[in-house]
Amino acid sequence: MKKDVRILLVGEPRVGKTSLIMSLVSEEFPEEVPPRAEEITIPADVTPERVPTHIVDYSEAEQNDEQLYHEISQANVICIVYAVNNKNSIDKVTSRWIPLINERTDKDSRLPLILVGNKSDLVEYSSMETILPIMNQYTEIETCVECSAKNLKNRSELFYYAQKAVLHPTGPLYCPEEKEMKPACIKALTRIFRISDQDNDGTLNDAELNFFQRICFNTPLAPQALEDVKNVVRKNVSDGVADNGLTLKGFLFLHTLFIQRGRHETTWTVLRRFGYDDDLELTPEYLFPLLKIPPDCTTELNHHAYLFLQSIFDKHDLDRDCALSPDELKDLFKVFPYMPWGPDVNNTVCTNGKGGWITYQGFLSQWTLTTYLDVQRCLEYLGYLGYSILAEQESQASAITVTRDKKIDLQKKQTQRNVFRCNVVGMKGCGKSGVLQALLGRNLMRQRQIRAEHKSYYAINTVYVYGQEKYLLLHDVSDSEFLTDAETICDVVCLVYDVSNPKSFEYCVRIFKQHFMDSRIPCLVVAAKSDLHEVRQEYSISPAEFCKKHKMPPPQAFTCNTVDMPSKDIFVKLTTMAMYPHVTQADLKSSTFWLRASFGATVFAFLGFAMYKALIKQR
């Protein structure tokens, strides 16, 4: 909504433009009228819409055409004043003023016009019969008001309607020729309906209607008022009410009715509450609220955000199988202007074995990934879902936790983070993709079913360490000789080499020495494809000796060529190293240290599976 309103009064000489302005200010008819009134400003606290309003007078005697054109360009709304007792001034509305104004404004963004019939005290008839055909001819005319500066009739209403034409314009909402709402308005209201339909049954029940009424208008509807609304819809739309709930068709009919009855401020209140601007686009302020992220800090979803996303998942998981089918996912994203997830997402997070559909855990993981890698996009997505409205928060920023500086974690030897990034490094063909897919529980046979164009360079899943659920985010970095700064920023590094390729380990050594040897980032060497015949690596010392020399844990044997899911031991170790980068080399070598971490992972994985089964049974 505009922060202020600028009203320009134009019209033929002596129709009473200046008198109208002066009578509004002084509350009485001026005996002496100057050729032109000075610009006046009405403070926000004395206007119904609480917006400061500037009223500008135009005088043909004192101003030239260039000054008139400038005032037109600055105005938000123009009042064309005519005298009801002067036919010539009425004729000039269409022969002079409307064409002149339209020539000076863009065709796609015409200024709203108010026709003002002044001096109604001098006649006993109305000019409306003459004016109505003009209003029907020009869609930019918002309304017509007959008034009298002399007896103060309707002069306050005149400026109220002018202000309303700017703050609650009819043009973007409604097409008078077709007598129906415009497509952009229907699209916006349809999104609002889908967000408000919290149980996804295609209707707004009484609880949903009351919630909608409260968040938009700050007041609930009385039960009788609710029934009255539904009865109006029933009488006018055959399928506007179903199972005693308001359908989308009924919802759209109500807003059409509001607009037709001149109550378009009601529709605008709803649209603006859900983030729309005057062009029916979601505002940048709504989609991208301010969120300060200091250096060396990361972004995560907080508990309230996860609860919200759980409710969104439940809303669209219609068959209650704890996975979203392609149709269910498409239905979920109907409130988005585009499909945000591509086929690579299915290879980034966990899917079910039946149809390769994104599971409940995979759904939350993808949101966690987006929040960590691109928090602005996460804010945008939460905005499309209506987070701030449904969660009754000021903005989506309240869904985000900004972690503390990593240097503080190192000093205190503990972290509050829940998401840890591991960069997976290795030469092409060494098995990095296998490591990523193994995090999602996929063996080599399942990995071979992935199409090349759907490959993902990220994988994310939960890992349990000492009974704590954490997210491990794996990133397959490029296999170039020199990594970019962005490719070296992480919490832990996984150096992968192929045991069957004699040149594979040497690449890991070069990358380690160039980027990580002098850093405080812990590194773990993974001997991939351990099911194959191991050959001697073409490097001066063996991988085991290299790890010992640089105070790293010994190389971890790994293969995804298994009958069942690959082992998750390396993921527990990587997450543990990321959580406790200060742990000494002696601790890292201790079997007891890893046993405690792995035991916690096993216990909580079992508990998680039991809770998952209970959830399915309960639902």
Swiss-Prot record:
Residues reported in the UniProt entry to bind Mg(2+) 2: G429
Pfam entry (one): Ras
Keywords: Calcium, GTP-binding, Hydrolase, Magnesium, Membrane, Metal-binding, Mitochondrion, Mitochondrion outer membrane, Nucleotide-binding, Repeat, Transmembrane, Transmembrane helix
Binding sites annotated in the UniProt record for Mg(2+) 1: T18, P35, D57
Gene3D superfamilies: EF-hand, P-loop containing nucleotide triphosphate hydrolases
Topological region Cytoplasmic: 1-593
TM helices/strands, residue ranges: 594-616
Binding annotation for Ca(2+) 1: D197, D199, D201, T203, E208
Claim: Transmembrane is one of the keywords in the record: yes
A biological-process GO annotation: cellular homeostasis
Any one cellular-component term (Gene Ontology): mitochondrial outer membrane
Binding annotation for Ca(2+) 2: D317, D319, D321, A323, E328
GO molecular function, one term: GTPase activity
Boundaries of every EF-hand domain copy: 184-219, 304-339
Main location: mitochondrion
Residues on Mitochondrial intermembrane side: 617-619
Source superkingdom: Eukaryota
EC class: hydrolase
Protein family (similarity comment): Belongs to the mitochondrial Rho GTPase family.
Protein name listed in UniProt: Mitochondrial Rho GTPase 1
Gene that produces this protein: RHOT1
